[in-house]
């Protein structure tokens, strides 16, 4: 049994193995090795891509799928997340995929539940499967990470994608640049260098845009003039290197962080990221449940990612 809660739990070997497995699955490798097992998807925040990507991945692997949201569970009656997951485990769930608004929600689960927990996003914390699909997309484009420059633009402070990606890209040998409004800088993130939007775009092999995380701000941020000041406008896109590509974890706010004309342009890999997400999540689910480590063992502690 192997949880996945944060990217720093994965070794470089783990990352390469997951990407390679996802690539084989994408080629059409038939795989229903998890047939008959139950996956519980528990989402306490809105989600389109991550939620349905996991569901498609689970069904491609032959799994039975239980979809829950915070409104339809007994959490609304005061039940703790821990008791909810223990309930799902007791009625037969083999793995639990969770998105939650609280950072590190999984701390109360790891070592106390007998099924794998896969983090589908925790507040401003981590989003490991998004990072993995981003890495897969970059590797498909370049065949490497070392020596690349990846710039991350926008709401760095509130973005779990920025936090997950900056750490792992640095570990893989890429250079990370940050760009965005001063008030959205993440001073606790040591993995990137802050530069101007123009400098970031001009020097990057991969330009990764982020949406404004309105739901994590105390008051709604102004979007007026954001595109021209900080986003990837058509004018700023003229600075892109010849082979540079555009990425975005989505949802995309067209005309805010990126000009609408660029979303489906020849440089964009945004929908390729979404496609790759299915296969990465298939690989993550297989890793969680196979290799003889999926036996439920009560409440004992587990060592992550042996």
Curated annotation (Swiss-Prot):
PANTHER family: ASPARTATE CARBAMOYLTRANSFERASE, ORNITHINE CARBAMOYLTRANSFERASE, MITOCHONDRIAL. Catalyzes the condensation of carbamoyl phosphate and aspartate to form carbamoyl aspartate and inorganic phosphate, the committed step in the de novo pyrimidine nucleotide biosynthesis pathway. One of its GO terms (cellular component) is cytosol. Keywords: Pyrimidine biosynthesis, Transferase. Belongs to the aspartate/ornithine carbamoyltransferase superfamily. ATCase family. HAMAP family: Asp_carb_tr (MF_00001). Pathway: Pyrimidine metabolism; UMP biosynthesis via de novo pathway; (S)-dihydroorotate from bicarbonate: step 2/3. The gene is pyrB. Carbamoyl phosphate binds at residues 49-50, 99, 127, 130, 250-251. Coiled coil: none annotated. This is Aspartate carbamoyltransferase catalytic subunit. Its EC number is 2.1.3.2. GO terms for molecular function: amino acid binding; aspartate carbamoyltransferase activity.
């Amino acid at each position: 049994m192997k949880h996945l809660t944060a990217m720093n739990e994965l070794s470089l070997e783990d990352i390469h193995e997951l990407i390679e497995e996802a690539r084989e699955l994408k080629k059409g490798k038939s795989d229903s090795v998890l047939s008959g097992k139950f996956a519980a998807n528990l989402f306490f925040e809105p989600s389109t891509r991550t939620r349905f990507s996991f569901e498609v991945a689970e069904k491609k692997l032959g799994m039975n799928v239980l979809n829950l949201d915070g409104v339809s569970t007994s959490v609304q009656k005061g039940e703790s997340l821990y008791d909810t997951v223990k309930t799902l485990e007791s009625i037969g769930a083999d793995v639990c995929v969770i998105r939650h608004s609280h950072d590190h929600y999984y701390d109360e689960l790891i070592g106390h539940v007998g099924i794998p927990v896969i983090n589908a996003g925790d507040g401003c914390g981590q989003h490991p499967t998004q990072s993995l699909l981003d890495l897969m997309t970059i590797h498909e484009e370049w065949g490497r990470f070392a020596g690349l420059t990846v710039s991350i633009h926008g709401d760095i402070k509130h973005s779990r994608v920025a936090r997950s990606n900056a750490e792992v890209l640095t570990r893989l040998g890429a250079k990370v640049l940050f760009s965005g409004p001063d008030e959205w800088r993440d001073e606790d993130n040591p993995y990137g260098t802050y530069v101007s939007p123009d400098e970031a775009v001009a020097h990057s092999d991969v330009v990764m845009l982020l949406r404004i995380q309105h739901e994590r701000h105390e008051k709604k941020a102004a979007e007026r003039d954001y595109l021209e000041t900080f986003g990837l406008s058509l004018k700023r896109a003229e600075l892109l290197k010849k082979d540079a590509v555009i990425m975005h974890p989505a949802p995309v706010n067209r005309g805010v962080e990126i000009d609408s004309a660029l979303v489906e342009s020849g440089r964009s890999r945004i929908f390729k990221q979404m496609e790759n997400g299915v296969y990465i999540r298939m690989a993550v689910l297989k890793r969680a449940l196979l290799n003889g480590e999926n036996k439920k063992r009560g409440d004992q502690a587990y060592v992550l990612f042996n």
